[in-house]
Amino acid sequence: MRKMLNTLFITSEDAYLALENENVVIFRGEEKMGQYPLQILENVVSFSYKGASPALMGACAQRNIHVCFLTPNGRFLARVCGQSRGNVLLRKTQYRVSDDTAKSCTVARNMIFGKIFNCRWVLERMLRDHAMRVDAPSLSTASAQLQDQLEGIRQIDDLDALRGIEGMASAAYFGVFDQLILNQKEVFHFDGRNRRPPLDRVNAALSMTYTLLAHDCASALESVGLDAYVGFMHRDRPGRTSLALDLMEELRAPLADRFVLTLINTRVLQQKHFKMQVDGAVWLTDDGRKALLSAWQNRKKEEITHPFLKEKMAWGLVPYVQALLLARYLRGDMDEYPPFLWK
């Protein structure tokens, strides 16, 4: 099993990254704030406008350390990936499948099955653990709707129909998402998914976490030799990691959504960690971003048993394992792609 290394998060807006020997060094002006050996890193995520030196970016690319640049508010800017890895035949197969609507639907259908399955089990867990604190009939109704969609999704062989099912499932799930917020309800409320920009604190936290998860999925896909920009359900768009968005669909609910709910319900995130702009946008403050990133790293270290492989692993390795299973399917080593089904 692959070893999970560290992700270095740079949260200071005026930090500049440079290379010294085999270390990434963080500067603020002329002051050296810290340094970390490249050998312990697998990702660098920077929220600074100042960027990094070409020497550091080259060293990271050479060592397959993925570097991601975001704005301080978490909007994606650019990624440094280095040379493409893996067998060119695998990527050619990926492109052929992507160009074939029926074959694309076969893969995407399993991914969306995983998404709906996992959304349903987030609701079922809440009913099991906190039945007296939620509107149980509403959650039960939404769970039943998701179950109905699961039963019908296997017969779908059209991408537009699949997107329709996915949209209805998301509406049912997010329609009761506010019920999953158990504490700080006077501060955190959810009236529906919104982004670009997020308009409330819950959506601000979700958007930031989805950005981190998308980066992890893109890095995982590239590490096994797949092209993160060529998807099966999310179609080609310049600059969009479409396959990473496909892969993260089944991981949103069990990993990202539950993570954000935990931060709110345990008061790791509070009202003071958010700022409101005059245009209505809501963003994490510097302290809020640091709290979320620290908790995200800890969550990724937590162990689970992979439902398909029946092996224990850290949450942070799940995107890599799913990317590996997808590559095996495309090579013809598996009859179908097995989505991540969490309970």
Regions inferred by a protein language model and the residue ranges of each:
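Active-site helix-to-loop segments that bind/position phosphate- or nucleotide-bearing substrates
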Residues: 1-20, 29, 35, 89-343
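A surface-exposed, charged beta-strand/loop segment in the N-terminal or early-internal portion
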Residues: 40, 48-121
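Terminal-proximal segments
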Residues: 1-72, 82
